[in-house]
């Protein structure tokens, strides 16, 4: 069916998201039951993010996962500066202009959570990040729910043991999935990731719900996609907006 969004409009929305961090293509993401709240979850980072030289320090966000955070658009093309890790960094840097905010991608195309867990200590924790995001839902369909849960849990627990804050991401859209079918593997993996966020009381970016809100309003997610399973810049900007909110909506700790 014809796209309800023209390319100029998509461009305007993407620019607005990047520069302001306040415009949503699909509206506000549904709330998920978890103890994590944006105003306090990363409150320990409020001081380093707002500090000025010479008192500021590097704040590291590591984005771990598969081809989406790696920046794959239409395979084999990689566009890291149009992907959500980089776009998130731009939004956060605009919010905290004196911060030294560094985003590092440890994502590998084609990887699932078991493979990501196997190299988590060496590739992620060794970098001593302040925050790590985990995004494997799309590829975990090929290993099943039980194996995926075990791998996600191992990464979450390893990060927490190292004092690293964790933000989970549900999968971005896939035009081959049937989100209206409760038994669709992508639906099931998105649900399991939400459960993990609740179980561990950690932050969540519900990318799957945002893409579905867009589909409900526009009849298709095609304007957000570069190919069936990879978002385009507009899709990445949608994820970046929500991820950045965990940093930009921080309130000062009570002691400050």
Q: What are the language-model segments listed below?
A:
Residues 33-106, 119-128:
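Serine-esterase "nucleophile elbow" of acetyl-processing enzymes
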Residues 68, 76, 105-111, 133-141, ...:
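Cell-envelope and extracellular/periplasmic
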Residues 70-74, 112-114, 140-143, 175-179:
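A short acidic, helix-capping loop that chelates divalent metal ions and anchors anionic groups
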